[in-house]
A protein has these predicted regions:
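Residues forming the Rossmann-fold NAD(P)(H) cofactor-binding site
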Residues: 110
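Conserved GNAT acetyl-CoA-binding A-motif
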Residues: 120-132
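Conserved N-terminal entry element of GNAT/NAT acetyltransferase domains
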Residues: 9-34, 161-168
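Active-site acidic-Proline motif in GNAT/NAT acetyltransferases
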Residues: 100-106, 134-135
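Conserved active-site tyrosine of GNAT-family acetyltransferases
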Residues: 143, 148
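Conserved beta-strand-loop-alpha-helix junction that forms the acyl-donor binding cleft
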Residues: 130-139, 157-161
Length: 168
């Protein structure tokens, strides 16, 4: 354990202790204690939660590792967007990228992706992947506008702990 690291506290770098991006309308920063309920409500409003994924567990897991975090965007002191970001040392992945339905079309999604990319670049990561659910065609065009394109690999999956599977 790091010196000064308190049990139950997530280790934070200098990067995570400051706002990532701040503008006249939007401030993007790492998730803070007390933000969890608002972030989960945002994910639910955006249709990102699934019965087999416990969003509170996903948040805790991402926050408990130095190679991942959850970024949030605030407008008028309300959480209006998020991006979960992590990496394996050279390849970064973004999950739960979303903007509150009432706030879409204001450029917040672009700013969230840019903040997640900046988070990865600061850690020496040079490639970013996005996870997009099958059938979510509307968001694919958005990501293509940002320079993302279908890759040459296909994601395959296996539940290695069947008890966690739930109803797919």
């Amino acid at each position: 354990m790091d010196p000064g690291h308190k049990a139950g506290m997530t280790r934070r770098s200098n990067f995570k202790d400051r706002a990532l991006m701040s503008g006249s309308e939007l401030t993007i920063r790492p998730i803070a204690e007390g933000d969890e309920a608002a972030v989960i409500a945002l994910w639910q409003a955006c249709g990102l939660t699934r019965p087999w994924n416990d969003p509170a567990r996903d948040l805790a897991f991402a926050r408990g590792k130095p190679s991942s975090d959850v970024l949030v965007a605030l407008a008028d002191n309300r959480i209006v967007a998020s991006a979960m970001v992590g990496h394996d040392g050279h390849r970064g992945t973004m999950y739960y990228v979303c903007v509150a339905p009432a706030e879409q079309g204001r450029g917040y999604g672009r700013q969230m992706v840019a903040a997640a990319e900046a988070w990865l670049k600061e850690r020496g990561v040079w490639k970013a992947n996005l996870l997009v659910r099958t059938g979510n065609e509307a968001v694919l065009g958005f990501y293509c506008e940002l320079g993302y394109e279908p890759g040459s690999t296909q994601q395959i999956e296996k539940w290695i702990d069947p008890e966690k599977r739930g109803d797919r």
